Each structure stands twice: as structure tokens, then as C-alpha cells.
A protein has these predicted regions:
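Conserved alpha-helix/loop element of class I SAM-dependent methyltransferases that forms part
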Residues: 23-40
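Conserved class I S-adenosyl-L-methionine
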Residues: 41-50
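Class I SAM-dependent methyltransferase SAM/SAH-binding core
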Residues: 53-101
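A short acidic, Gly/Pro-enriched loop at the edge of an enzyme's catalytic core
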Residues: 101-111
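A short SAM/SAH-binding and catalytic strip from SAM-dependent methyltransferases
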Residues: 110-127
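A short glycine-rich, Lys/Arg-flanked "PGG" loop and its adjoining helix->strand segment in the class I
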Residues: 127-145
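Short, glycine-/aromatic-enriched active-site segment of Class I SAM-dependent methyltransferases
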Residues: 148-169
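Conserved Class I S-adenosyl-L-methionine
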Residues: 191-256
Length: 256
């Protein structure tokens, strides 16, 4: 059995327990939306949108606002289009199966990218983050806003933490380093928050680890059972024995 089949079992777009593919509570999301404060008729882009739940909520928060979800995962795009249709947003939220780094529309009032900096090629992960911030700054009008989500270390990573997240020592910096990186491309922070431990625990439990475990319990005789269980165990070791409490996701609401 292939690694692709195991990933399909544990995939985020097929997991209806995940509201969004990021460690984010409802209360935290509401604060991000309030800080972004899209005006009526705002144009919003989400680069690397997944199925676009956050994009749709931003659009719903502002009468007449429209959104472009830019996403290459066909399963995520299909889920997003279905959700938009069910919520009466099909004419206001559109999904584009285009790589985020190739999206060239600009003049947006708000540009969003959560955990997708890897979509912008760079010689290092840090360079990809800089390239993502540069692209987001270019996508918004003067005075527009950017919502950027990126991984940071809250303390010096251990070898187990690096292995668990699959990172090299220089891939992620501190929260202050991320803020300074945004400033280097002309983006100033209006609000800075990070995912807390409870958000991460719930995300991991509802996400690939939990989805995989629920599937394994329901399918004990499936040919993929042993491989899925091994993947669950590896992810548990990586999170609980590695990056839990040291790595997190920062959410920066920025102004151009």
C-alpha cells in the first residue's frame, strides 16, 4: 500500500470534524475576523485557502464582500465549493485551483495566508516565509490588511521537537523575528496572537491523529490498518514527545 493511500485516510479535506486546517478556536477566529475588519464590499483573497472556512466567515462578516480562495488541493476545492453553495455564497466566494505563488491579482482590501508559506519557493523555509509576506503585501491596496499565519518557536527547539515537526534548525524563528520580517516588507502588526496548547491539542486530536485512530478502530481488518496505525504512532511521538509546548502558529493581522 502506498503512502498516498495512508495520507488519503488521514487527509484534512475529508475530515468533517475539522472546521479549518489549523489550530484555531472559534473565539480566536472571531477575534481575528474582528481585527481584519473587512468593510462592506471588501475584496478578500486567501492564498492557500484549503476549503475556505475562514475566507467564507470573513466574507459573511461584511455585506457585499467577495472572496477568492486560491488552492491546489482538489478535495479541498470541492469541499469549499460545496460549503459555499450550501451557505448561499457561491456568487461571492470563488475557488481557483492555482498555486498561491502564481496568483497575480492585486488591489485586495485583505489578503490571507495561514500556514501556507511553503507555497512560495525559497532556498530555505525562512526565505519562503519572506517571499510569502512580500506577495501578500503586493496583493493588497495601500492601507489594506494582511492576515498571516506562520509557525514559530516559543523556546529553543530540542532535537525531538525538530524531528517531530520535520524542520531544520533555521526553518522557523521567534515571534519577534516574524514580526520584524513582516516589517521588512512594509507590513506593520495591528494584532498578534498565537495558538495556545488547548487549540493545538484539539487540532491534533480532531486532525490526522484523531481521524486516523477513529478510522483504525472502525476498520481493524483493512489492509491499510497496520500502516495507518504506524503513522498515528509516529505523529503522536512527534507531537506529544516533540514539539508540543515549544512550536506554535502565530496569527499576525498586519496593515500595509
Amino acid at each position: 500500500m502506498s503512502a498516498e493511500e495512508v495520507r488519503a485516510v488521514m487527509s484534512a479535506p475529508g475530515n468533517d470534524r475539522l472546521v479549518w486546517n489549523t489550530p484555531l478556536s472559534e473565539e480566536h477566529a472571531a477575534r481575528l475576523i474582528a481585527a481584519c475588519d473587512p468593510a462592506p464590499g471588501a475584496r478578500i483573497a486567501d492564498l492557500g485557502s484549503g476549503w475556505g472556512e475562514l475566507l467564507m466567515r470573513l466574507v459573511e462578516s461584511a455585506p457585499g464582500a467577495t472572496g477568492d480562495g486560491v488552492e491546489t488541493d482538489p478535495d479541498a476545492v470541492a469541499r469549499g465549493r460545496k460549503l459555499a453553495g450550501e451557505r448561499g455564497l457561491a456568487d461571492r466566494v470563488r475557488f481557483h485551483p492555482t498555486p498561491a505563488a502564481e496568483w497575480t491579482e492585486d488591489g485586495y482590501d485583505l489578503a490571507v495566508s495561514i500556514g501556507s508559506s511553503h507555497a512560495w519557493p525559497g532556498a530555505t523555509a525562512r526565505e519562503s516565509t519572506l517571499n510569502a509576506l512580500t506577495a501578500l503585501a503586493a496583493a493588497v491596496r495601500p492601507g489594506g490588511r494582511v492576515l498571516f499565519g506562520e509557525g514559530i518557536w516559543q523556546r529553543e527547539p530540542t532535537p525531538a521537537a525538530l524531528e517531530g515537526i520535520g524542520a531544520e534548525p533555521g526553518d522557523f524563528g521567534s515571534l519577534l523575528e516574524l514580526i520584524r520580517l513582516a516589517e521588512s516588507v512594509g507590513l506593520r502588526a495591528l494584532q498578534v496572537t498565537v495558538a495556545d496548547e488547548r487549540e493545538w491539542d484539539l487540532f491534533e486530536s480532531e486532525g490526522p491523529i484523531g481521524r486516523g485512530q477513529r478510522w483504525a478502530l472502525a476498520n481493524p481488518d483493512h489492509p491499510l490498518h497496520a500502516e495507518v496505525t504506524a503513522e498515528i504512532d509516529a505523529r503522536r511521538t512527534g507531537y506529544y514527545g516533540g514539539y508540543r509546548s515549544s512550536f506554535t502558529l502565530a496569527y499576525l493581522v498586519l496593515s500595509s
